[in-house]
Amino acid sequence: MYLPRDWEPGDAYPLIIEYPGNIFFTPSCYSTGLPDQCAIGYGMTKGTGAIWVSLPFIDRAAGTIAENGWGNPADTADYAVDVVEQMGDSFGGDRRNVVLTGFSRGAIACGFIGLRNDRIASLWQAFHLCQHFDGDGWRGATMESAIGRAGRFRGVSVFHTDNSEEKVRPVTEAMNVPTTFVQSGLGAHSTAMFLDDRDSTKALRRWFIDVTGGDDQ
């Protein structure tokens, strides 16, 4: 959990929930598969104006955090609901202003976990997905099932970084909300683009302000 630099007790703040990618190693990126490596939430806000929480994929029965795969999807979804409630109760997280984001596995999880049932689907004001999407076929995230999940989305907007508009179109049409696509130009499977001020990251920050009603920092 990251409280913004301008956090004050008693105030309300938009809430960013972020899921990490899998564990993997490439010359350009070492992904641990753990939530402490998440970076998108910081890139969205530069550390001000919103609470940012990175979540694990969990299996309660095994007592483990899944570095690869979903863990237990039902447990992972229930944990997210509990965290959003806790952030609202204890830290001023605005339950009407929650943005779900993720990279790679985490991007798929926006739909596969975040729209798993009506209870969790009701949380989200908006989605941001980076370099993958629900419906690309990974670990049960088929296009047919993703379209079904997309019908549960009750938010107002979706933003994609480094995804193909054509490939995502069936899910986009099912969600039926304004959707933005940008290309970062990073040329690597990584979240490094969110740590600088390239055009795609600045566009994401403007979008976040628009969907949450925040102030430009």
Where are the predicted features?
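Gly/Ser-rich "nucleophile elbow"/oxyanion-hole loop immediately N-terminal to the catalytic nucleophile
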Residues: R5-D11, I65-S104
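Structural recognition of the beta-strand scaffold that forms the well-ordered cores
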Residues: L15-Y19, I51-P56, N97-G102, C110, ...
